[in-house]
């Protein structure tokens, strides 16, 4: 029997909504990256974008384990000499765009390249509980019920 290869025209994309309140960042990002790539489907094909559209709400309420909330540092470079910049996870979550912590975690779990960039466009992350995608009728995915370690008990 020949290996199955999904054609781009045969892809069926679903809409999934995840409430990130109280969920651990890395574990949540791993599940989201798998959904975006389509690896949860039996029809997974490496060169085809057959993942789902994922909506994440309450991204400002994600949690870190251990001391990562205060100690984890995100670096970037401005392009100028001596232009290395840094922010802690705490500064970003308490700042203007707290959803970027989760976006960056997922982005670093998706392969780099044209297909990875296209798959990342299927991710919508919102800091609060409101989102403009009710018309797509997203199905709720309860990440907390998948594994007890996905939720941080304070």
Swiss-Prot record:
Ribosomal protein found in the keyword field: yes
Mention any Pfam family matching this sequence: Ribosomal_L13
> Which keywords has UniProt assigned to this entry?
Ribonucleoprotein, Ribosomal protein
Any one GO MF term held by the record is: mRNA binding
**Record's Gene Ontology CC terms?**
cytosolic large ribosomal subunit
Has UniProt tagged this entry with the keyword Ribosomal protein?
yes
All disulfide bonds of the chain are: none
Q: Name one GO biological process term.
A: translation
Q: What does this protein do?
A: This protein is one of the early assembly proteins of the 50S ribosomal subunit, although it is not seen to bind rRNA by itself. It is important during the early stages of 50S assembly.
Instruction: Output the HAMAP family linked to this UniProt entry.
Output: Ribosomal_uL13
The UniProt subunit note reads as follows:
Part of the 50S ribosomal subunit.
Which family would the database say this protein is a member of?
Belongs to the universal ribosomal protein uL13 family.
What is this protein called in UniProt?
Large ribosomal subunit protein uL13
Species source reads Rhizobium johnstonii (strain DSM 114642 / LMG 32736 / 3841) (Rhizobium leguminosarum bv. viciae)
